[in-house]
């Protein structure tokens, strides 16, 4: 908290983020550090944030805006590019939200039901392409040490399903989670054999380990 502050009003960051109420002023207030480009994803801040009229006007002043979205709405209408990702039954699914609200420890994975358009791209593929293009133009990225750049490149090379597989295997129920490798550990391959999901038992306390 409060590791740095917003340019215009000096609002403190929290968790690496600024209050959304600062977005419009950071775009329409001239000076060093003024926001001149914006990337949005599946959102409509013109309607969902305070002082939407000011933000609506500010978005018109951007030099470049790209929206990863399947809808043209009050926000994305200002984008120079709208990149629609595959969605719904065209993409693999692993629930990250409702698993955290469950009363038991469960896991379930589903492959795409439909292939989608041959030219279509997933959110991950779109953001990977944007990231690679931005890094080519970034002096800061080129100045990073080779180890960090290699780590970032390796992460970008993994698909979301591959990243999920690594996370499952490294988790407490995964084959890499204990001291010994286990063939029966949780993985994407194991979940594919259980299309209705797996029940790993009651929840277990984990907060102390997450804190220390």
Regions found by a protein language model. Give the residues of each.
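Non-catalytic alpha/beta scaffold blocks inside enzyme catalytic domains
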Residues: 1-168
């Amino acid at each position: 908290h409060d590791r740095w502050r917003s340019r215009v009003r000096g609002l403190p960051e929290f968790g690496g983020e600024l209050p959304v109420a600062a977005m419009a002023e950071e775009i329409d207030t001239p000076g060093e550090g003024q926001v001149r480009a914006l990337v949005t994803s599946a959102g409509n801040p013109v309607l969902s944030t305070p002082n939407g009229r000011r933000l609506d006007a500010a978005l018109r002043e951007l030099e470049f805006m790209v929206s990863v979205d399947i809808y043209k709405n009050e926000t994305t209408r200002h984008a120079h590019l709208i990149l629609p990702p595959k969605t719904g039954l065209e993409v693999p699914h692993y629930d990250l939200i409702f698993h955290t609200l469950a009363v038991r420890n469960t896991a379930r994975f589903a492959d795409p039901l439909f292939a989608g358009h041959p030219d279509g791209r997933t959110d991950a593929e779109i953001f990977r392409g944007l990231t690679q293009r931005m890094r080519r133009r970034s002096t800061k990225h080129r100045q990073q040490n080779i180890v960090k750049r290699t780590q970032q490149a390796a992460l970008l090379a993994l698909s979301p399903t591959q990243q999920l597989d690594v996370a499952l295997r490294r988790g407490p129920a995964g084959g890499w989670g204990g001291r010994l490798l286990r063939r029966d550990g949780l993985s994407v391959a194991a979940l594919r054999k259980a299309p209705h999901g797996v029940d790993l038992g009651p929840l277990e306390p984990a907060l102390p380990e997450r804190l220390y």
